[in-house]
Amino acid sequence: MSGRDSNREYRRKRRIRSQIISYSVMAVVLIAVIAGCAVGIRAAAGMIREKREAKEASIQAAEESARAEESAQAQSAVEELLGMESTEAETAVEYTPEDALNEMVEESVAGMTLEQKVAGLFFVTPEQLTGVGQAVQAGEGTQEALATWPVGGLVYFKQNIQSEEQLREMLANTASYSTFPIFLGVDEEGGRVARVADALGLENVGPMADIGSTGDVQAAYTANQTIGTYLASYGFNVDFAPVADVLTNEDNAVIGDRAFSGDPQTVADMVAGAVEGLQSAGVSACLKHFPGHGDTAGDSHTGAAETDRTKEEMDAAEFLPFRSGIETGADMVMVGHISAPSLTDGEKIPASLSEEIITGILREELGYDGIVITDAMNMAAVTDYYEADVAAIMALKAGADMILMPEDFQQAYEGVLQAVQDGTISQERVDDSLKRIYRVKLRDKIS
């Protein structure tokens, strides 16, 4: 082979070797690229998978959080509902008949005008209300009078009673004509003070002295339950009885056999039985005549009547039956017109006008929070010394809730109205009395 051919062969082999090397390098590079792509693809796939898993985890967490929140809200709603039911149940348990009565009383008093409130403090005869000479029926005149002066109560006497049918109709009509609940009262003690029994020829239960002499408290209960039953059947809801006076002065004719006894404890026991008997029949009892009329010689109907007994003596005797009647639940206490200087720092003032006696002793010492009513204000023990309006104002300021039979109803009413308007008597004081009155009037409306 010539030298030229050898060189050509050498260059060909070198070119081939270079090509082989180039192809090899290219193959290596290609393999590296392919491998890198594969790795990148796997990495990308991993990243995508991780993101997807993260997203799914986030969605799942959000869903679980939402479910938890919904559950919490539902639980809260249930607890709130249960709490409301529990509160309502507690409220229902705590809302007592006493609460219902208080609410009715508050609403009744709040709904009255001042004129109506003042009229509601008076307890008068039908003649005083209407101006007629003798009232034996309740018609248009009674209706108009009650619309003008819606008095708190009307008291009837023998002259007003002709027959059972007439009495029932008169009282039923009167009650229906009154805008507000009204007291319909009478003096029915038994014995010589029995307006209804005497007028209608009913069997008289007899004087309380006879019952007291037996020492039988059940007899006092039965007699007064009998009285209460027939009074209620005609439409009466107040009896100005029992007499709680202790007859310590045998010369005291105005009380006499109207009292159960001269022994304080006997009177106290009998009074408790009498109160229970009357009020079991639905008729309010009225203890009388505070602070005690049993020791006086005078008659407050015709003039001044006075007792010289000391506070200590009265506390041990006269007050005992009143305490007993109050503890038994008497709806009313009547304050008499006797003067008791030992109770009023020597002042000779009718008890019915004395703040020391009504507020200081009856209210505060004896703890009485029921209705305090004066004895009839047309008695000489009052009228000889005071005008009707002055006496009514004094009684209310002293602590009385109701004024019984003022000498001049119109004068007394106008006087009290003016006293409230000018601040001599506060409206709060009037409201306090009306609330005590309406607690009794509305009590039976609470089941």
Outline where the language-model segments fall.
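N-terminal hydrophobic targeting/anchoring segments and the immediately downstream early-domain regions
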Residues: 2-184, 188-195
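Second-shell loop/turn segments in exported
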Residues: 90-95, 105, 128-133, 153-162, ...
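Second-shell residues forming the walls of enzyme active-site clefts
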Residues: 113, 133-134, 138, 163-176, ...
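Conserved beta-strand positions in the central sheet of alpha/beta enzyme cores
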Residues: 123, 155, 239-240, 286, ...
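Short beta-strand elements of ligand-binding domains
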Residues: 181-188, 240, 428, 433
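Substrate-binding cleft of extracellular glycoside hydrolase catalytic domains
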Residues: 182-224
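A substrate-binding/cap region within the structured catalytic cores of diverse enzymes
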Residues: 206-275, 279
